[in-house]
Structure formats: structure tokens, C-alpha cells
């Protein structure tokens, strides 16, 4: 006989403890609020101390801030251990923190230092977060590890070579960890966004102009991807409704990555 249970509306993470890296701004800050609204105790991890602490103070009880440079393993160890000491467990590790290229350029114009910076945060930082989350989840035989990747892992040209390789590493890590950690009841997934206007991506440009350009280029008309679209996708993967979902790259791009522009152009010419 099938059994079905549902958490109270708006409380899909009731009783859960979550760490969200890069949680002081952008996608991370929205995820912090949505996870908190859904009943989770949330630890914000970031290097933007004023923003992170201000968000924790705004949301109040059940939300705290810990400074953490995710490319520094000692910082990550402290983040996880402090969370477990405070709340007694860690249910969800959302490795969301990331950086983009200073200049969106070709491989010919990309210095080695830019590649190393992207790999250090986007790939190695996520690796370290997953490593130390798994360290405390394995004895409990359960847990959820999430990442933010990118739709550039699905279609060429959405990101620079350096950024793309750093995010491909995340998707590869998701698949590898899902295979390794499944025996311990730990699920591992990622969310891959299409372009969206955040403080990091706009870099002083009017967000409305960025959104207009992305909407014009995008496949799904009449909709604009915002941070809550990604945070809600992460919420689904984090909650018990996704209890048998692991090893997946949930691409949130309005169908952009499955579109063949050559075919669409030919179709328009014919008609």
C-alpha cells in the first residue's frame, strides 16, 4: 500500500539544518530566506561579513552567519564543525558560492591566475564543502549535498572557457559523489541556472538591461529568471519530496540548452 505524508504548507524543511555558502547575496541570500521560511535552521557562509550578518539579523532566530573562505580548508572545517556543535547535526550542505571571470574573454586572453581563481572557488571550494559535509553525514547515514553549477555545462558559448571548465568540474563531482555516497543514504545534486541578473553578474550595469537581454536571447518567452527560481529548485532537491533524486543536474534555463538555433532559423525561413 502506498504511503504519503506532507509537511505543513511552507515548512518543507521543518527540523532540518542547512549550510548555504555564498549566502550573503544573490542566489545564496534568496536560498537562505526560502530555506528559513520552510522551517530550516540556516547557517550563512560567506566572506561578505557585513551583508551576511545583516541578513542573519534580519531573519532572526534560526539563522546565523559564519565567515568562511570556501577555498580554505580550515575555514570549511570550522564552518561544518561549528554548525554541528550549535545544532547537533547537518542535513543539507548547499555549495552555492562561486565567482565569475573578471573579463568574459576567450582562452587567448585568459591569464592562468583567472583560471586558478575560478577553479579554487567554484570547483575546489565545492569539493571541500562536500568533503566535510560528508564527514559528518556518513555516520548519520543520511544527508543532502547540493551545488550551484551552470547551464554552460549543457550548451557551449554561455560561459568563458575558464568559467565553463570550473562548472563542468562541479557537475562531474555531483555524479561521482552521488555514486560514492549513495551507500550512506546521502543524496547529491546540482542546479544549473541560465543567466540571471545578480550583483555579481551585473557589475554596475542596470539589472533591467541585463534581464531584457537575457529574456530576448532566451527560449521561454514571457518569463524572466530571477534568484528565487534557482533557490526554489534547490529547495525541491533539498526536501523530502526529492528523497530518491540523486546524481542529477537540474537545468533551470527555460529550455535554452535544448534549442538548436540553426533549426529554428531554418524553420522561420521556410515559413
Curated annotation (Swiss-Prot):
Family annotation (Gene3D superfamilies): NAD(P)-binding Rossmann-like Domain
Pfam family, one: adh_short_C2
InterPro entries (alphabetical): NAD(P)-bd_dom_sf, Sc_DH/Rdtase_CS, SDR_fam
Reaction catalyzed: 21-O-acetyl-isomeliandiol + A = (21S)-21-acetoxyl-apo-melianone + AH2
Pathway(s) the chain acts in: Secondary metabolite biosynthesis; terpenoid biosynthesis
Keyword Kinase: no
Tissues in which the UniProt entry reports expression: Mainly expressed in petioles.
Superkingdom of the source species: Eukaryota
Active site as annotated: 150, 163, 167
Gene Ontology terms, MF aspect: oxidoreductase activity
Cystine pairs: none
Keyword Oxidoreductase applies: yes
Key words of the record: Oxidoreductase
EC number: 1.1.1.-
Role this protein plays: Oxidoreductase involved in the biosynthesis of limonoids triterpene natural products such as azadirachtin, an antifeedant widely used as bioinsecticide, and possessing many medicinal applications including anti-tumoral, anti-malarial, anti-rheumatic, antibacterial, anti-inflammatory, anti-pyretic and diuretic effects. Catalyzes the oxidation of 21-O-acetyl-isomeliandiol to (21S)-21-acetoxyl-apo-melianone.
Protein family: Belongs to the short-chain dehydrogenases/reductases (SDR) family.
Protein's name in the database: (21S)-21-acetoxyl-apo-melianone synthase SDR
Organism: Melia azedarach (Chinaberry tree)
Lineage of the organism: Eukaryota, Viridiplantae, Streptophyta, Embryophyta, Tracheophyta
Gene coding for it: SDR
Amino acid at each position: 500500500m502506498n504511503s504519503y505524508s506532507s509537511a505543513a504548507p511552507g515548512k518543507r524543511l521543518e527540523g532540518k539544518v542547512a549550510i548555504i555558502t555564498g549566502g550573503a547575496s544573490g542566489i545564496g541570500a534568496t536560498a537562505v530566506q526560502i530555506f528559513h521560511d520552510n522551517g530550516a535552521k540556516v547557517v550563512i557562509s560567506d566572506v561578505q561579513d557585513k551583508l551576511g550578518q545583516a541578513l542573519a539579523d534580519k531573519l532572526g532566530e534560526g539563522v546565523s552567519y559564519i565567515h568562511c573562505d570556501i577555498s580554505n580548508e580550515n575555514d570549511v572545517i570550522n564552518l561544518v564543525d561549528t554548525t554541528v556543535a550549535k545544532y547537533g547535526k547537518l542535513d543539507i550542505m548547499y555549495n552555492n558560492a562561486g565567482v565569475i571571470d573578471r573579463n568574459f574573454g576567450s582562452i587567448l586572453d585568459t591569464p592562468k591566475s583567472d583560471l586558478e581563481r575560478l577553479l579554487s572557488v567554484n570547483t575546489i571550494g565545492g569539493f571541500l564543502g562536500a568533503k566535510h559535509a560528508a564527514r559528518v553525514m556518513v555516520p548519520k547515514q543520511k544527508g543532502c549535498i547540493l551545488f550551484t553549477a551552470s547551464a554552460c555545462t549543457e550548451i557551449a558559448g554561455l560561459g568563458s572557457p575558464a568559467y565553463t571548465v570550473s562548472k563542468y568540474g562541479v557537475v562531474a563531482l555531483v555524479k561521482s559523489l552521488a555514486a560514492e555516497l549513495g551507500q550512506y543514504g546521502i543524496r547529491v545534486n546540482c542546479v544549473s541556472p541560465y543567466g540571471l541578473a545578480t550583483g555579481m553578474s551585473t557589475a554596475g550595469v542596470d539589472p533591467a538591461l541585463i534581464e531584457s537581454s537575457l529574456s530576448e536571447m532566451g527560449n521561454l518567452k514571457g518569463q524572466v529568471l530571477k534568484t528565487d527560481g534557482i533557490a526554489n529548485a534547490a529547495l525541491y532537491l533539498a526536501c523530502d519530496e526529492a528523497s530518491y533524486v540523486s546524481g542529477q543536474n537540474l537545468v533551470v534555463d527555460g529550455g535554452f540548452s535544448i534549442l538548436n538555433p540553426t533549426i529554428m532559423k531554418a524553420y522561420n525561413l521556410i515559413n
